[in-house]
Regions:
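A general lysine-centric signal
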Residues: 3, 7-8, 40, 78, ...
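Metal-dependent phosphoesterase signature
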Residues: 4-28, 37
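Hydrophobic beta-strand core positions in alpha/beta domains
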Residues: 42-43, 120
Length: 148
């Protein structure tokens, strides 16, 4: 049994993560607005597939997503751009047409290396991440709508 499976079996049941409480409240309305505007949307996350699917369900955005991919389904992790390039291919779009929303330095680098424009979502107060390589830093998910 791998460490992740053992963790889920032993630790997780007694220590659930309150994802619904941690979810950015702007996620669903912004994703719905993007969908209404005809913007193709994907989630390209380094998280495990099970967690991505769980968070998509909690956020209530499965019906407005065109594609999801886990870093564990790729041959290389961020900062390698593979995850973004595969998402772009699945959506049938070119890198220059894409806007990547990231927070981590490795994700920002992966997005830049894919050829997309990258917006960095400023982290919560007290979290210090180097987001200097992003094309711009945004404070709220609603700022995405103005960036299109």
């Amino acid at each position: 049994m791998c460490i992740r499976d053992r963790y889920k079996q032993v630790y997780s049941p007694d220590h659930p993560v309150p994802y619904a409480e941690l979810l950015n409240e702007q996620t669903e309305p912004v994703m719905r607005e993007l969908h209404e505007r005809g913007v193709k949307c994907a989630i390209a996350s380094s998280s495990y597939r099970e967690l991505i699917d769980e968070l998509v369900e909690i956020a209530g955005i499965a019906d407005v997503l065109d594609y999801t991919i886990s870093g564990h389904e790729c041959s290389a992790f961020k900062p390698d751009p593979e995850i973004y390039l595969r998402a772009m291919e699945a959506l049938g779009v070119e890198p220059a047409e894409c806007l990547v929303i990231e927070d981590s330095p490795l994700g920002i680098e992966a997005g830049k290396r894919s050829g997309a424009r990258v917006l960095a979502l400023r982290p919560h107060e007290g979290v210090n991440l180097d987001q200097s390589r992003a094309d711009a830093v945004i404070d709220n998910l609603t700022d995405i709508l103005a960036a299109l």
